[in-house]
C-alpha cells in the first residue's frame, strides 16, 4: 500500500466513525428507538449505509434491535462505558475534592449536566457547625446554581437555548430571568467561573468552575451559607481555579483552548 492509499484509508475510517457518532446521537435523542428509515432521514445518509453501520454497532452492543416491531435504540455497552467513565472521574477527582474542602472548610461537590439539571456525582460535606449538606445523586436545576451555569456555558448556543427552554422556573427573589442568565453565561464562558447568590435557595450560595477533561465536562463547586460568601468569594475563586488547573493537569484536558 502506498502513502496515497493509506491516506484514503484513514479518511474513510474517520468518515465511518463520524457517521456512526451521528447515528448514535440521533438514537440518543429518541430513547424509545427509531426505524432505519427514520435514522437515515435524521442523519442524511442512504438507508443501506445506515444499515451497515447499525450492524457493526449492534455487534459491539452499542446499538440493539427493538424486536419484532423493528427499529433500534442505544445498546447496553454504551451505559457500561458511561459508568466506567464516571467511576474513573470519581476516583481521580476525590483527592482534590478533599483538599479543596479542607482548605476552604466548606462543602464541595463534583457534578455533571443531565438535561436542564445537574447531577451531583460526589461531594465532601463541611464539618463546620453552620454548613450546607446535600446528598450524592441529587438533581438540582442547572440555571439557578453555579455548578449548572459553568456546564450550561460550555454548551453550543443551539443546545443551550434548548436546555433553557422558553421560561425558567423562579425559586427565590434572586433567581435570574432568562435574558439576564444568558448574558451571565456569556461572561462565564470567558472566565470559566460562576456564582449563585441565593438564586436557588435563600441563605445558600455557591461558586463553581468548569472541569474540561478527556472524560467530559464536569463542574467543581463550593456550596456554603450566604452569611460567609461575600467575605470569601475572592479566596474561593482562587482556590477553585487552582484546583481546576491541578485536576486538568492530572487527568488531561479534552480541548486545548481554555473555556
Curated annotation (Swiss-Prot):
GO molecular function, one term: DNA-binding transcription factor activity
Record key words, sorted: DNA-binding, Repressor, Transcription, Transcription regulation
Gene3D superfamilies with a match to the protein in the record: 3.30.450.40, Winged helix-like DNA-binding domain superfamily/Winged helix DNA-binding domain (1.10.10.10)
Any GO BP annotation: negative regulation of DNA-templated transcription
HTH iclR-type domain span: 14-76
UniProt xrefs under InterPro entries: GAF-like_dom_sf, HTH_MetabolicPath_Reg, Tscrpt_reg_IclR_C, Tscrpt_reg_IclR_N, WH-like_DNA-bd_sf, WH_DNA-bd_sf
PROSITE patterns: HTH_ICLR, ICLR_ED
Residue ranges occupied by any IclR-ED domain in the UniProt entry: 89-253
SMART domains in the cross-refs: HTH_ICLR
DNA-binding region location: 36-59
Entry function: In conjunction with SrpR represses the srpABC operon.
Protein name: HTH-type transcriptional regulator SrpS
Organism: Pseudomonas putida
Name of the coding gene: srpS
Amino acid at each position: 500500500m502506498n502513502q496515497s492509499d493509506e491516506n484514503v484509508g484513514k479518511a474513510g475510517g474517520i468518515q465511518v466513525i463520524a457517521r456512526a457518532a451521528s447515528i448514535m446521537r440521533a438514537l440518543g435523542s429518541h430513547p424509545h428507538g427509531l426505524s432505519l428509515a427514520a435514522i437515515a432521514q435524521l442523519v442524511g445518509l442512504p438507508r443501506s449505509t445506515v444499515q451497515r453501520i447499525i450492524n457493526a454497532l449492534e455487534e459491539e452492543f452499542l446499538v440493539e434491535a427493538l424486536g419484532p416491531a423493528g427499529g433500534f435504540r442505544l445498546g447496553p455497552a454504551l451505559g457500561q462505558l458511561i459508568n466506567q467513565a464516571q467511576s474513573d472521574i470519581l476516583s481521580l477527582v476525590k483527592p482534590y475534592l478533599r483538599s479543596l474542602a479542607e482548605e476552604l472548610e466548606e462543602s464541595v461537590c463534583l457534578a455533571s449536566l443531565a438535561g436542564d439539571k445537574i447531577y451531583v456525582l460526589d461531594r465532601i460535606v463541611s464539618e463546620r457547625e453552620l454548613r450546607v449538606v446535600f446528598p450524592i445523586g441529587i438533581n438540582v436545576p442547572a440555571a439557578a446554581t453555579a455548578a449548572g451555569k459553568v456546564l450550561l456555558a460550555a454548551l453550543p448556543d443551539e443546545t443551550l437555548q434548548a436546555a433553557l427552554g422558553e421560561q425558567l422556573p423562579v425559586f427565590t427573589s434572586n433567581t435570574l430571568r432568562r435574558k439576564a442568565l444568558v448574558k451571565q453565561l456569556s461572561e462565564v464562558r470567558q472566565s470559566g467561573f460562576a456564582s449563585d447568590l441565593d438564586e436557588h435557595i435563600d441563605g445558600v450560595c455557591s461558586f463553581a468552575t468548569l472541569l474540561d477533561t478527556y472524560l467530559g465536562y464536569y463542574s467543581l463547586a463550593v456550596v456554603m451559607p450566604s452569611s460567609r460568601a461575600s467575605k470569601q468569594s475572592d479566596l474561593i475563586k482562587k482556590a477553585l481555579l487552582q484546583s481546576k488547573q491541578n485536576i486538568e493537569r492530572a487527568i488531561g484536558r479534552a480541548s486545548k483552548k481554555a473555556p
